Amino acid sequence: MRRSTLSGLFGFFALLLALTADLSAAYQEPPFKLETGWLPEHETFLIWYAKQKGWDKQEGLDIVLNRFDSGKDLIGNADKWVIGACGAFPILTSPYPEQFTIIGVGNDESLANAVMVRPDSPLLDTKGANKGYPNLYGKADDVRGKTIICPASSSAQYLLTKWLTAYGLTTEDVRIQNTDAVPGLQAFFEGEGDAIVLWAPYSYTGDEHGLKVAATSRSVNAPQSVLLMADKDFATPVRWLPSCGSTSGPSA
């Protein structure tokens, strides 16, 4: 586990330095200020750790970590960063997905994106009733007509769609309450809704408060990868390692 984390750290920092190599060389005094955007997730720790060690300064960079609570928020404030990371769904549902270039793929967060319910939910009474989804709890009748709290334009929204599809349902069969993760969790704790769809670290908060997982992205065959991206206008003129592609074409 430690070796894997360190390997990811060194690999990611090497990628970042490769992207900004020409810039850092040209701006030795003072360091080149590099605005970046992050969510409260694992990948943020990697770059935070590198900054704590002063590795950015060693390469002529001053990396600024701007925090956002969701991918939608991060994408909506794209003018505040040139390199960032979030799930694919917020990028692809943004008004201008062609603005971003994918430069790397981070964690598979399929287990951290979850549909969560209260311990007494009828959904938990049945498991594996849906053919092809052995780890999925509940049946269509347990879900139909229920109120689901889910942040819009997020990996949670993608999971919600795939979760309903697994039951043979659509968004027309349930009541969807589009609320951001933090206020959504608070509302759920206070008794609103029948289920809530979250990603880490908010799914961890739900677990700490006794909520149960009725489904994950993995259990409904909906992979969720973190994408590392750069503003295309920033990345294009910089000579570095070949990118993984642009969001204007096929992407993960």
Please describe what each predicted stretch is.
Residues 17, 50, 137, 228-229:
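A generic, residue-level signal for flexible/boundary positions that often mark functional hotspots
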Residues 10-22:
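Bacterial N-terminal signal peptides
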Residues 27-170, 175-178, 194-200, 216-222:
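Short, glycine-/small- and polar/acidic-enriched structural segments
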Residues 5, 173, 239-240:
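Single-residue recognition of alpha-helix capping/boundary positions
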Residues 1-10:
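Bacterial N-terminal signal peptides that target proteins for export
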Residues 183-252:
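Pocket-lining segment of extracytoplasmic ligand-binding domains
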Residues 1-2, 23-28:
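Basic/polar N-terminal segments that are highly enriched at the extreme N-terminus
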